[in-house]
């Protein structure tokens, strides 16, 4: 279903995000990250995409990339005035730092 939506509208952020989550939840992490990359390149202020991409990167033990993703996500959330998303990403960033 999501692939059908994306075939007609490749920039549909909701469908792209949903597909990335499906891949991540099913353990297809490289596919998930590719979808998050597509999502964020066409929707750079989609804050939830950064957060979930960072979580997927952590599942792949790509801590430095997850940190960078969160930093970009915090900036995106601040551009949109989404303090809640920025706060969640700051928390995750602190947790990643504490795990070292």
What are these regions (language model features)?
Residues 4-5, 38-39, 73:
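Canonical positions in the second alpha-helix
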Residues 8, 42, 76-80:
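Structural marker of alpha-solenoid helical repeat scaffolds
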């Amino acid at each position: 279903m999501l692939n059908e939506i994306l075939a007609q509208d490749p920039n549909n952020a909701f469908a792209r995000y949903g597909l990335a989550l499906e891949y991540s939840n099913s353990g297809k992490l490289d596919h998930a990250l590719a979808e998050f990359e597509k999502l964020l390149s066409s929707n750079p202020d989609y804050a939830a995409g950064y957060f979930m991409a960072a979580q997927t990167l952590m599942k792949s033990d790509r801590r430095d990339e997850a940190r960078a993703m969160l930093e970009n996500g915090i900036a995106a959330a601040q551009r949109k005035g989404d303090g809640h998303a920025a706060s969640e990403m700051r928390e995750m960033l602190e947790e990643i730092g504490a795990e070292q």
